[in-house]
């Protein structure tokens, strides 16, 4: 029977989705399930790994049954996942020994501070391209081994396995056939040497993490295992693609040439610039990471993460009650010709790239008696664009490549005002794709390439479709004046920090 589809699992921070794509890269069907967020203490975020599995299984069942999809028509399965989130489980029983510690969680902060105080930042930066931060997986693993009785000894005996969410899903979908991850996820653990392309013994020793726990690292497009027959009505499907969510979006946006950039406007913003075979070391507070591994070689990227983007609109809606629906923000923003000199620096949980300051908090500047709700909302949307420019200016400086366009995805960029203002403040066109599910599409493309469903990246690039192109309209002098005001606001925010 000729395969018609590729299936993607998009396992995110708040929900799991299953999306079926046809050969043209169009969506045939989808299903989604949310799951619980667990907050044991302020600043800690955990998930139940078993509930994540249940949510994934439910989406697969719903998608296939509702669409009456014959599993024999599915060529392959690709997985994309929330990165850095950490699971440790029992090799024999498959049961997790602790909740998954989520990428957002700060519970391993003290371990990070110890590593910094011992002077290990330069080593970690050189080997991994990352900063010492609780964001990444390594200190989360150390925390679990420290806080679950007997875990260190069991790990040393080879009884425990570690994985990011992709590894956890492949292990369970395959019935324990494969304990694997891909280069893009391994590069986010703080344990992987992005130059030698292997787990780094010095970093493992630094945190006393046994190598026996770690998954095998493979290309992002490869047949790792097959699904257990019971998942697809006794029809095993090759699990053939893995990529962390932001790298998958870069692939789904067909950013295959050095210098191409995508920005995902979600709860936060995540920008990746493809840098090809070169691992560019940042001088400006960005992360050097692996984009993907294909055909036995890896390609690299520069990454900048903004902690608060679309969530500022949720704050306007839920916290301040300024709007009833997120979509109302656009209508309010265009009621005024500008923000009236108001700047919002949404450092609610600190500032990410390129500042990396967790000790600052949000601030607002330029308020007058004439400031009203529309100015406030407009300033909140403009803050996303200013933060994006901060990161993209750093990327261009690091890579020595001038930005010619920005490919944008994510829910927030459906806001036409934001898209237009972003193009204005960057001075380059913003391209919004026809298909916004670029993360899942990237995972599908990687899986499809592994089994020959798609033949090449050139074929994939030709399928990329444009919804709308936003050209910059603002005069250069006005653009730079507005951005200078933003820089002043950030400088003042950095000066007013918390202990």
From Swiss-Prot:
ADP binds at residues 13, 17, 267, 310, 411, 415. Disulfide bonds: none annotated. The gene is glpK. Pathway: Polyol metabolism; glycerol degradation via glycerol kinase pathway; sn-glycerol 3-phosphate from glycerol: step 1/1. This is Glycerol kinase. Pfam families: FGGY_C, FGGY_N. It catalyses: glycerol + ATP = sn-glycerol 3-phosphate + ADP + H(+). Belongs to the FGGY kinase family. Sn-glycerol 3-phosphate binds at residues 13, 83-84, 135, 245. GO terms for molecular function: ATP binding; glycerol kinase activity. One of its GO terms (biological process) is glycerol-3-phosphate metabolic process. It is an enzyme of class 2 (transferase).
């Amino acid at each position: 029977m000729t395969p018609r589809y590729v299936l993607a699992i998009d396992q995110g921070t708040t929900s799991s989705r299953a999306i079926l794509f046809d050969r043209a890269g169009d969506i045939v069907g989808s299903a989604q399930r949310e799951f619980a967020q667990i907050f044991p203490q302020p600043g800690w975020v955990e998930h139940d790994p078993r509930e994540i599995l249940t949510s994934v299984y439910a989406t697969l069942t719903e998608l296939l049954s509702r669409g009456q999809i014959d599993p024999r028509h599915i060529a392959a399965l690709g997985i994309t996942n929330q990165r850095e989130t950490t699971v440790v489980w029992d090799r024999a029983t498959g049961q997790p020994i602790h909740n998954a510690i989520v990428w957002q969680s700060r519970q391993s902060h003290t371990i990070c501070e110890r590593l910094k105080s011992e002077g290990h930042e330069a080593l970690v930066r050189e080997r991994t391209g990352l900063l010492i931060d609780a964001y990444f997986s390594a200190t989360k693993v150390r925390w679990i081994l420290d806080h679950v009785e007997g875990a260190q000894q069991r790990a040393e005996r080879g009884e425990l396995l570690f994985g990011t969410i992709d590894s956890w899903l492949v292990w369970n979908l395959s019935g324990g056939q494969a304990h694997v991850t891909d280069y893009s996820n391994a590069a986010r653990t703080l344990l992987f040497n992005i130059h030698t392309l292997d787990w780094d013994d010095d970093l493992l020793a630094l945190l006393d993490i046994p190598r026996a726990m770690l998954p095998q690292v493979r290309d992002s497009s490869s047949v790792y295992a097959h699904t257990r027959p019971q998942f697809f009505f006794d029809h095993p499907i090759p699990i053939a693609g893995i990529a962390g969510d932001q790298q998958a979006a870069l692939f789904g946006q067909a950013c295959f040439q050095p210098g191409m950039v995508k920005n995902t406007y979600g709860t936060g913003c995540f920008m990746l610039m493809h840098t090809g075979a070169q691992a560019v070391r940042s001088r400006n507070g960005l992360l050097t990471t692996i984009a993907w591994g294909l055909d036995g070689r890896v390609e690299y990227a520069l990454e900048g993460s903004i902690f608060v983007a679309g969530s500022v609109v949720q704050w306007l809606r839920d916290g301040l009650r300024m709007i009833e629906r997120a979509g109302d923000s656009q209508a309010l923003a265009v009621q005024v010709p500008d923000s009236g000199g108001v700047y919002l620096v949404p450092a609610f949980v600190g500032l990410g790239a390129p500042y990396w300051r967790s000790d600052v908090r949000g601030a607002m500047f330029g308020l007058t008696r004439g400031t009203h709700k529309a100015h406030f909302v407009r300033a909140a949307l403009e803050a996303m664009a200013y933060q994006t420019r901060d990161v993209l200016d750093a990327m261009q400086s690091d890579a020595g490549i001038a930005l010619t366009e920005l490919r944008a995805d994510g829910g927030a960029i459906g806001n036409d005002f934001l898209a237009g203002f972003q193009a204005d403040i960057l001075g380059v066109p913003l391209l919004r794709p026809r298909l916004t599910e670029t993360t899942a599409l990237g995972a599908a493309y990687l899986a499809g390439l592994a089994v020959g469903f798609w033949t090449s990246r050139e074929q994939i690039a030709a399928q990329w479709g444009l919804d709308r192109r936003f050209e910059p309209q603002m005069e250069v002098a006005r653009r730079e004046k507005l951005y200078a005001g933003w820089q002043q606001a950030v400088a003042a925010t950095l000066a007013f920090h918390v202990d």
